[in-house]
């Protein structure tokens, strides 16, 4: 009986396992909130308050003065927080009722309640949270909710 080639489908798992890193280098949270109140999404102070609460609750450390830009009605705001653990970026699109958050952290952290916080503070109708473990390819993506 001939040997199965290494690139055969039945050997794909073995190849991925052998090549996969054995260490996690933190995580990434990709959060999309939709059906949000458009006026709230234009408020830089509200968006900064949400970001500051995420940072405080997860005990992250901000480096420098976080840049932010208000695009002006009908558009939203963008804010970027450089963290000693990586970064937090937020972009709002009031014309679509959408806010997007991206938090990358080089260490494991507690879980922040994105769902209820964004529903309460941005009047989000839907919040989608995706968590990726960085560096751990075998567990590259975890859907937290839809």
Show which residues each predicted segment covers.
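Polybasic/polar functional segments that serve as interface/processing modules
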Residues: 1-146
